[in-house]
């Protein structure tokens, strides 16, 4: 790993760090024991395909394995997957020495071990302005705006890589849908309790599942004790059903969650078609019992490969690798998404759930659309009345009859002599043992994390530490403390307001600090959508889940509408439209705060461009577009060598000398991580609005920074000249090192305000 080729590959994969995985975050666990103690699954990545014929691609993989193993039969038995559509590569059972040997082959870019990843979930569309909406397909004439202009996304195809789908869900009905788009090349695969003819329809048009990677990881056979799932696309976990129907679920009226959040449930693009790619499985935990959703790299890569072939418009991948590390293996694990984007498919990824610390954001590659999570303007307040008539409010999902009991305090040091049976218990630590104690309810005081749960059937209320301390003070000053708890209600609109969720991962980007991440934010807290009836959080086929896993398909659904309206837009143009038109205040005009250890006003490292605004994104005026040439510039600026880039792209590529600056990558943002004195960078915009337009620059400089734009006016005169370039000079007046300060650059024609965030940190050289 010390030669220059391997070093540049490390950087290569660092840039290719991407989005595969689901916001409900994933921990990396090396796949253990394949078919025997000496072999395990490795992924051999070969870059772009050398043949258009998939059979020839697969044949070349067999030849490479046969040459390595010196046996045609051994090569056939070793091969797990052939990646033949979107890119070239294969997964195979190899010993470590065989993996090392094949990595030295001149056609091989890299060899990585299979990895196992662990899954970590009504009002949203009203909140974002995609309303009013009819209650059935019989009154579509009342639909206006983006939904009307796109026929509710009826020609869009949303691919979802996740834990599968529950095909009987009401949210997957195809009422009112016309024929499947002719460009669709995918299929529905039959399997356990999944009949392709019966369960697929004009809504669920694709259903594939990928078992080979996870089966090889657990010993080579499907073991029902370990993999507690269906050998088909049917969803035992529920996560995949939830994310798919957030993005493209059909209308389902009069839905609630135990009486909360009642209303019409629908996806962002209610008439879009859904293709489910099941690469995540319910696997028994190593410790503690129960199951987790696990997804292996080999299975995920094959899902990407097929999705590229099938013809999806957008890929929603609510999976993530946790906080990025400078690991070549971890970065290469995401390269499949690059090939999807290169072929025009927008890949939407989760920012992660390890927030609110800085540098935690996941899926940081510039070709990914990375989504943070916000709250809705909706809450579920629960009234807590102490025995002294003091009243407090906290959120919960408690919907039962009023609780009136004694009140006690427990902590991790409490002994079994404390009598809590039949009482409501106050705890400050979720690890405090209460199981088997017969408590009536739990009040869990905690720092804000925006996560609500039904706590396995025990009523639980979630006040913050301040209110928890008030309750504790009452307990300690009262001989026989009591409490009354009233069922939660649903409150929408003010005073509830939009916040970046405490769990949502934050920037700056730890891998490439000049690339702003996250890109955008969307609702991801207590989102009501369809779910598998096998999920313990399910009620009548629906559930409330939270996470960047949920905000990711919100954006995917919006992109399905945008691609219906603008089918020729590139993934970069789509991202630009979303980022430059986003709300930087809540839809009601209130400030957007960022939850965390200390609440503050949200900035670009919390929410990127802001809260997604679907209607404005449909008509952005200008876009900051990017293509393969721009991604080559990024790879060159990140230090990739020519041969590595050439293999990834499938054609000979030479980096310019001197290498380009990462500051000049044509992103809809400007991030300068180390400004010493001054720097000049460039951006290019494409007019997608009226042919004859005049835009003027409006500058909001970060504190202590002077921004100068040249020219200050952009004049578009004809359809032949829709692309113009401008420069931005940033000059610091700070005399000491600083943290980041934030501003913005807006191009305005009086109708469109095209806003990009600006983030600058001054670094004084010694």
UniProtKB/Swiss-Prot annotation:
Residues 22-120 form a propeptide. InterPro entries: Peptidase_S8/S53_dom, Peptidase_S8/S53_dom_sf, Peptidase_S8_Ser-AS, Peptidase_S8_subtilisin-rel, Peptidases_S8_3, S8pro/Inhibitor_I9, S8pro/Inhibitor_I9_sf, SBT. Its main location: secreted. GO terms for molecular function: serine-type endopeptidase activity. GO terms for cellular component: cytosol; extracellular region. Residues 134-618 form the Peptidase S8 domain. GO terms for biological process: proteolysis. Belongs to the peptidase S8 family. This is Subtilisin-like protease SBT3.13.
